[in-house]
């Protein structure tokens, strides 16, 4: 029934992120339990539109404006349906083949290149955390405009060349959009291309433009190491670097507001911590690491190839 609901206690959210914590969550739909390798996996069986009601109020706050929530609904619906169409169901649901086509690795003696996608999801479509999309139950959908946003955009998706767009998103891009092939897999998408998160307003035409010839409007060549270092060590003005507490409290959930250095940040590790982290992430024991050398960057300046010495 549409009114069926259940509650789960001590659900971990923000897995492996600095905001990781536990909370009680309530869900619509039915609960399916799978027992595998002496572990229980809970799967929420729910229709897409009810799922999205939770997603848009988990990824952002239910107090955001109607238009922001509507935009998020279209983006999240597009991503979900694009992902569902892109991975063969026989592979996704075959527990004997967890390392499917979405988990691609090319290795040589001196080079490890791997794209991580959804290889862990062999029993369900998407997970409930930041790895896919936040889905934190109906308690997040605390305002009526969340339901209005879903109803107003019902069935709407973004398309390109007749296909649903894989509309991946982030809360803060660091000032520049990255291209798909430098983050996810070696498949460029024309609708996910490099761009600066900033526009110049022309009062004569009332136009917002990315035009590079206007001061501050263009994106430097961030594949160049010197340009990338300058970009990273400074704070070029983007839309996503706001310190306006009113705006942040309107669009972000409470625990997201705890992170104030989301645009430019710094982490420090000891040699032992760095070695342990790389071993955990890559499965390779490099021993004592004495240097990290940038080899190749994407169009936003993010590293996609790194030399470990």
Regions found by a protein language model. Give the residues of each.
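Conserved, single-site charged/polar hotspot
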Residues: 1-309
């Amino acid at each position: 029934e549409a009114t069926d609901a259940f509650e789960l206690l001590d659900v971990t959210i923000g897995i492996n992120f600095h905001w990781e914590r536990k909370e009680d969550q309530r869900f619509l739909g039915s609960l399916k339990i799978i027992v595998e390798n002496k572990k229980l996996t809970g799967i929420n069986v729910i229709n897409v539109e009810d799922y999205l009601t939770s997603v848009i109020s988990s990824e952002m706050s239910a107090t955001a404006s109607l238009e922001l929530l509507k935009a998020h609904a279209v983006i999240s619906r597009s991503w979900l349906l694009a992902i569902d169409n892109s991975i063969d169901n026989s592979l996704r649901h075959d527990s004997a083949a967890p390392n499917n086509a979405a988990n691609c690795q090319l290795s040589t003696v001196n080079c490890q290149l791997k794209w991580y996608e959804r290889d862990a999801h062999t029993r369900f479509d998407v997970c409930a955390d930041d790895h896919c999309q936040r889905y934190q139950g109906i308690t997040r959908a605390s305002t009526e405009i969340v339901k209005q946003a879903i109803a107003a955009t019902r069935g709407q998706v973004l398309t390109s060349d007749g296909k649903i767009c894989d509309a991946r998103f982030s809360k803060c891009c660091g000032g520049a959009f990255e291209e798909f092939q430098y983050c996810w897999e070696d498949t460029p998408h024309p609708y996910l291309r490099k761009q600066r998160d900033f526009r110049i307003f022309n009062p004569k035409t009332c136009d917002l433009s990315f035009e590079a010839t206007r001061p501050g409007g263009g994106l430097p060549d961030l594949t160049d190491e010197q340009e990338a270092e300058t970009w990273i060590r400074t704070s070029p003005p983007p839309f996503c670097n706001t310190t306006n507490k009113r705006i942040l409290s309107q669009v972000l959930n409470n625990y997201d507001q705890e992170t104030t250095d989301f645009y430019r940040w710094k982490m420090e590790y000891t040699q032992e911590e760095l070695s342990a982290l790389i071993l955990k992430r890559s499965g390779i024991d490099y021993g004592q690491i004495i240097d990290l050398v940038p080899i190749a960057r994407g169009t936003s300046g993010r590293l996609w190839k790194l030399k470990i010495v």
